Amino acid sequence: MELNQLRCFVSVADELHFGRAAQKLGLMPASLSRHIRMLEESLGTRLMARTTRSVALTDDGLFLLEGAREILERTEVLQNRFQTSRQERVEILRIGAIDSAAAGLLPTLLHDFRQQCPEISTQLSEDKTIRLIPKLLSGGLDLAFIRAPDFVDPKLKTVFLFHETAVVAMSENHRLAHNTSVTIHDLADEPLIVPERRSRPHSHDLTMKLFIEAGLQARVAQLAEEKQTIVNLVAAEIGLAIVPQWTARLAVSGVRYVTLQTDAKEAMNKLPLSAAWLKGVRDPARDLIVSLLQSRISQYAENA
C-alpha cells in the first residue's frame, strides 16, 4: 500500500467517477484504474464495485476511506512541517576573533561576505587566542582569527593573513603627542602600559623586543589585559602603550595615536594575524569566506 495509491483511491471515492478523478489528479483513466487495482491486490479485497455507469464503495472500501483520509492529512501536516523548517533553517557560520580582528578586519570582511552569500548568517565571538583555540578544537567555532602561537595543534589548519601595524597610544598632553611619528629611542625612559604575556604573548613580546632591538630597556609602569583598559590608562596619563593601529577606532577622549617608525631590520613592529580552522571538517560556508578573504587579502591588508 503506497501513499499515491491512497490518494487515487480517495479521489475516486470523492468523485465516484474514474474519468473526473483521473482529470483531477492529472492521470489517464487507465493509469488511475491500475493504481486502484494494485491497491486492492495489496490489501487482498475489493474496494469498489464498478459498472459501466457507476462506482460504489464496498464495505471494505468505506472502512479504508476513513483511515486513508487520516493518513493523507497527517502526511500533509508532516510534509508542511519539515518544508517550513527547511525554509526557515539558516546556515550559521560561527567565527571567533581576537579583539584586533574583530574591530579591524571583520567588519569589512563580514560586509563583503554578506553581499556575496546573503543566505549564510554569521555569529561572531570575540576572545583571546588562548581561549579561541580550544573552542576550535572542541567544534564550538568554525573559523577563528588569531595570533598563531609558536606551536599549533596539528589538528588545526592555520593560514597567515597579514601583519597589523603597531602605533603608540599616548595622552594628548604628552610632549610627543603632536609628532607625526616617533621612534623607539623617543620612548626611552617613558613609562609603558604593557599587556600581560600570559594572555597576550604577541603584543607583550612586541613591546619588549622593540626595545631590546634598539638596545634599550622597556620601563613597564603597568600591566593590563584588555585593550580598552590599556587605552583608558593611557588617557589617565599612566603611561604610553604600543598597540595595533585598529585601537584608534576606540576613540577614547584624550588619547592620540602616533605612527611608530622603526629601522628596516626591525620587522617586529607588526603583529601577525592568521586564520585557523579544524582540519578534516567539511564546511562549505567556511570555505566560501576563506576564499573571499584570500581573493581580497591585499585590499584588507592595506588598512591593517
From Swiss-Prot:
Q: Which Pfam families match?
A: HTH_1, LysR_substrate
Q: What is this protein called?
A: HTH-type transcriptional regulator TtuA
PROSITE patterns per the UniProt record, alphabetical: HTH_LYSR
Give the InterPro entries listed for this entry: LysR_subst-bd (IPR005119), Tscrpt_reg_HTH_LysR (IPR000847), WH-like_DNA-bd_sf (IPR036388), WH_DNA-bd_sf (IPR036390)
Which Gene Ontology cellular component annotation is one that this UniProt entry carries?
Answer: protein-DNA complex
Q: What does this protein do?
A: Transcriptional regulator of the ttuABCDE tartrate utilization operon.
- Gene Ontology molecular function: DNA binding; DNA-binding transcription factor activity
* DNA-binding region extent: 18-37
Q: Which family does it belong to?
A: Belongs to the LysR transcriptional regulatory family.
Ranges for domain HTH lysR-type come to 1-58
Keyword entries, A-Z: DNA-binding, Plasmid, Transcription, Transcription regulation
- What PANTHER family does the record tag this protein with? HCA OPERON TRANSCRIPTIONAL ACTIVATOR HCAR (PTHR30346:SF0), TRANSCRIPTIONAL DUAL REGULATOR HCAR-RELATED (PTHR30346)
